[in-house]
UniProtKB/Swiss-Prot annotation:
SUPFAM superfamilies registered for this protein in UniProt: Ribonuclease H-like (SSF53098)
Enzyme class: hydrolase
Species classification: Eukaryota, Viridiplantae, Streptophyta, Embryophyta, Tracheophyta
Function: 3'-to-5' exoribonuclease (RNase) specifically targeting single-stranded RNAs. Triggers miRNA accumulation in RNA-induced silencing complex (RISC), composed of miRNAs and AGO proteins, by degrading uridylated cleavage fragments. Required during plant growth and development.
GO cellular component: cytoplasm; plant-type vacuole
Catalytic reactions of this protein: Exonucleolytic cleavage in the 3'- to 5'-direction to yield nucleoside 5'-phosphates
Location within or outside the cell: Cytoplasm
Name of the protein described by the UniProt record: Protein RISC-INTERACTING CLEARING 3'-5' EXORIBONUCLEASE 2
First-listed, main subcellular location of the protein, grouped into a coarse class: cytoplasm
């Protein structure tokens, strides 16, 4: 049975985020973990899945290729209130990643991200991956609060402006980022996902 058996991190409100990191191989079945993410988003998160994508950047081999054609998806982070799933993706993609494509195509959850427009374009152009129900939470915050600058803030700054929450835990990791180990980097990823869950909840209630 699939379980999030990675490190568990305590958030500032006393709750915990359970993590799972998967190096996706040709025989890796990620669908049970995606199902757990979807289930937690429905039960505990206003049907929202917080997503972040990470890229490997190369250079076009010929002049006919665009500047973005050398970008390839290297990993994906999916977060809910209680869970954080980090997928390291193979090159080239395997057939089992169709589960990820289907997950992103779901109409039953909202995929929430920060400054996501370029990522959405790259996913579609370079991988044929379409996120059907995606929301830029910074843009939503800017409209809700009447403050344009919120649309252009990163995760930390946006969470600070919307929630005014204690970011000391995240700041301490980022201050030593170059020396931080994999577990500390995973903790930072879990905190960022959890913060945006709370930003989404706050804006949804306004």
């Amino acid at each position: 049975m699939a379980s999030f058996d990675g490190p568990k991190f305590k958030m500032t409100d006393g709750s915990y985020v359970q993590t799972k990191t998967i190096d996706v191989g040709s025989s890796t079945d990620i669908s049970p973990y995606l199902s757990l993410i979807r289930e937690d988003s429905i039960l505990n998160g206003n049907r929202a899945v917080i997503f972040d994508v990470y890229w490997d950047v190369g250079f076009p081999e010929t002049e006919t290729k665009t500047k973005t054609s050398g970008w390839s998806l290297s990993s994906v982070k999916l977060s809910t209130r209680n869970l954080c799933l980090f997928l390291r993706l193979p090159k080239p993609f395997h057939d089992n990643l169709k589960d990820l494509y289907r997950f992103f195509a779901s109409k039953f959850v909202t995929f929430v991200g920060v400054q996501i427009e370029e990522d959405l374009d790259l996913l579609r152009e370079n991988h044929g991956l379409v996120i059907r129900n995606a929301i830029n939470v910074g843009k939503l915050a800017a409209e809700a609060r009447g403050t344009l600058v919120l649309e252009f803030l990163g995760t930390r700054e946006l969470a600070h402006r919307v929630l005014w929450s204690d970011l000391g835990q995240l700041d301490s990791i980022e201050a030593k980022w170059e020396k931080a180990g994999p577990e500390e980097q995973l903790e930072a990823a879990a905190i960022e996902g959890w913060l945006i869950v709370n930003v989404w909840d706050q804006l949804s209630d306004e």
